[in-house]
């Protein structure tokens, strides 16, 4: 049962993070198309946002390992 819980935690976190990354990147590209002069600022902000979004599945994988081994 704990194997299933770890798989669900990691799978749902990865699914949510990929959806979030897609939304962030698509809105950034849309903003760059509208205002090309602010592309550098948008790109930097996008990388910060993507990094914060990617922290969630990493934490979910750590929690999954804790479920498995503790």
From Swiss-Prot:
Query: Which InterPro entries does this UniProt record tie to the protein?
Result: ATP_synth_csu_bac/chlpt, ATP_synth_F0_csu, ATP_synth_F0_csu_DDCD_BS, ATP_synth_F0_csu_sf, ATPase_proteolipid_c-like_dom, F/V-ATP_Csub_sf
Q: Where in the cell is it found?
A: Cell membrane
Alphabetical list of PANTHER family matching this protein: ATP SYNTHASE LIPID-BINDING PROTEIN, MITOCHONDRIAL, ATPASE PROTEIN 9
Q: Record's superkingdom?
A: Bacteria
Family recorded in the similarity comment: Belongs to the ATPase C chain family.
What SUPFAM superfamilies does the annotation carry? F1F0 ATP synthase subunit C
Q: Does the keyword Membrane apply?
A: yes
Does the record bear Cell membrane in its keywords? yes
Which PROSITE patterns does the entry mention? ATPASE_C (PS00605)
| Record's subunit section | F-type ATPases have 2 components, F(1) - the catalytic core - and F(0) - the membrane proton channel. F(1) has five subunits: alpha(3), beta(3), gamma(1), delta(1), epsilon(1). F(0) has three main subunits: a(1), b(2) and c(10-14). The alpha and beta chains form an alternating ring which encloses part of the gamma chain. F(1) is attached to F(0) by a central stalk formed by the gamma and epsilon chains, while a peripheral stalk is formed by the delta and b chains.
Which Pfam families does the protein's record reference?
ATP-synt_C
Q: What does this protein do?
A: F(1)F(0) ATP synthase produces ATP from ADP in the presence of a proton or sodium gradient. F-type ATPases consist of two structural domains, F(1) containing the extramembraneous catalytic core and F(0) containing the membrane proton channel, linked together by a central stalk and a peripheral stalk. During catalysis, ATP synthesis in the catalytic domain of F(1) is coupled via a rotary mechanism of the central stalk subunits to proton translocation.
Q: Where is this site: Reversibly protonated during proton transport?
A: 54
Where would you say this protein principally sits, based on its record? membrane
The gene name reads: atpE
Kindly list the GO molecular function terms attached to this UniProt entry: lipid binding; proton-transporting ATP synthase activity, rotational mechanism
Question: What keywords is this UniProt entry annotated with?
Answer: ATP synthesis, Cell membrane, CF(0), Hydrogen ion transport, Ion transport, Lipid-binding, Membrane, Transmembrane, Transmembrane helix, Transport
Record protein name field: ATP synthase subunit c
Q: How does it sit in the membrane?
A: Multi-pass membrane protein
Residue ranges annotated as transmembrane are 5-25, 50-70
The record's Gene Ontology cellular component field reads: plasma membrane; proton-transporting ATP synthase complex; proton-transporting two-sector ATPase complex, proton-transporting domain
